[in-house]
Amino acid sequence: MPELPEVATVITELKSCVLNKPVKQVKVHLDKVLKNTNVKQLNDALVNHSFVDIKRRGKYIIFCLSNGLFLVSHLRMEGKYFFEAKGSQFDLNHVLVEFLFQDGDQLNYHDTRQFGTFHLFNRYQFENARELNKLALDPLDQEFNHQAIFNKGHKSNKKIKTFILDQTNISGIGNIYADEILFASKIHPETLAKNLNLSQYQLICQNATDILKKAVEMKGTTIGTFTFKKDHTGGYQHFLKIHGKKGKQCQSCNTTIIKKKINGRGSYICEKCQIQR
């Protein structure tokens, strides 16, 4: 699943090619991706209007329309956007939504797993959307701070990895970066959140910010299928210290890295650097 750095990278790419282009038509090839609207309503909202800005909240992509409406997209497991210039040849296999622009260009939403979602909101609905309002701050928000995370964590019986994956505690972090953050912090992912002290939360939060910033600079992590445009992959996979390295030696202590399931998530651990407490 694309995490914060991947979503941020997608948005940067989208802003470079689709802003201020009036929409001619929207074609939807799988109705279930539209969660609170339908094809007619979507066309009524978008045709003759343009995307004037694209923002992020957690892992959500927010298309801001020239008429004041908002189209909110979540990529889920395998969602991707591909921009196609006028006259280009492309395959519509796995394309669920086509945004056709009046200048002949188009933006395709591609999703092999078909888990992605779209919500159409007016301003009132957007400001009161449960999907968005339940999200916590993410590590790149200016107001993100370890004291607030500690205040939640010291009351929680969840394992710390499960705790930081919960988007109502910290948004934007997924499985890959959770492993990297906890390894950098030398904290075992099965340690209970309530058993960590304030300084450990400070370490988690600082590492989260540093790692996600670096991953954004590297245009995300490509493990599997992530691309931010056709034939362009991220680069942070070359900087991963622990995720995906089962059976390899820890770069810090040469201990063999193990993999185990924690609440259904494959988790990579150095049992010497990350002692369970």
From Swiss-Prot:
Gene3D superfamilies for this protein: 1.10.8.50, MutM-like, N-terminal (3.20.190.10)
The cofactor note reads: Binds 1 zinc ion per subunit.
Identify one Pfam family in the record: Fapy_DNA_glyco
GO BP terms: namely: base-excision repair
Which GO molecular function annotation, any one, does this entry have? zinc ion binding
Enumerate the catalysed reactions.
Answer: Hydrolysis of DNA containing ring-opened 7-methylguanine residues, releasing 2,6-diamino-4-hydroxy-5-(N-methyl)formamidopyrimidine; 2'-deoxyribonucleotide-(2'-deoxyribose 5'-phosphate)-2'-deoxyribonucleotide-DNA = a 3'-end 2'-deoxyribonucleotide-(2,3-dehydro-2,3-deoxyribose 5'-phosphate)-DNA + a 5'-end 5'-phospho-2'-deoxyribonucleoside-DNA + H(+)
Q: What are the names of the required cofactors?
A: Zn(2+)
Q: Which SUPFAM superfamilies match?
A: Glucocorticoid receptor-like (DNA-binding domain), N-terminal domain of MutM-like DNA repair proteins, S13-like H2TH domain
Q: Where is the active site?
A: P2, E3, K59, R265
In which residues is DNA bound? H94, R113
Query: Which keywords describe this protein according to UniProt?
Result: DNA damage, DNA repair, DNA-binding, Glycosidase, Hydrolase, Lyase, Metal-binding, Multifunctional enzyme, Zinc, Zinc-finger
UniProt EC number? 3.2.2.23, 4.2.99.18
The protein's matches in InterPro entries, at most eight in alphabetical order, are given as:
DNA_glyclase/AP_lyase_DNA-bd (IPR015886), DNA_glyclase_Znf_dom_DNA_BS (IPR015887), Formamido-pyr_DNA_Glyclase (IPR020629), FPG_cat (IPR012319), MutM-like_N-ter (IPR035937), Ribosomal_uS13-like_H2TH (IPR010979), Znf_DNA_glyclase/AP_lyase (IPR000214)
Role: Involved in base excision repair of DNA damaged by oxidation or by mutagenic agents. Acts as a DNA glycosylase that recognizes and removes damaged bases. Has a preference for oxidized purines, such as 7,8-dihydro-8-oxoguanine (8-oxoG). Has AP (apurinic/apyrimidinic) lyase activity and introduces nicks in the DNA strand. Cleaves the DNA backbone by beta-delta elimination to generate a single-strand break at the site of the removed base with both 3'- and 5'-phosphates.
Which family is this protein grouped under? Belongs to the FPG family.
Q: How does it assemble?
A: Monomer.
Q: PANTHER family, from UniProt?
A: FORMAMIDOPYRIMIDINE-DNA GLYCOSYLASE (PTHR22993:SF9)
The protein here is known as: Formamidopyrimidine-DNA glycosylase
Classification from the root reads: Bacteria, Bacillati, Mycoplasmatota, Mycoplasmoidales, Mycoplasmoidaceae
UniProt lists the gene as mutM
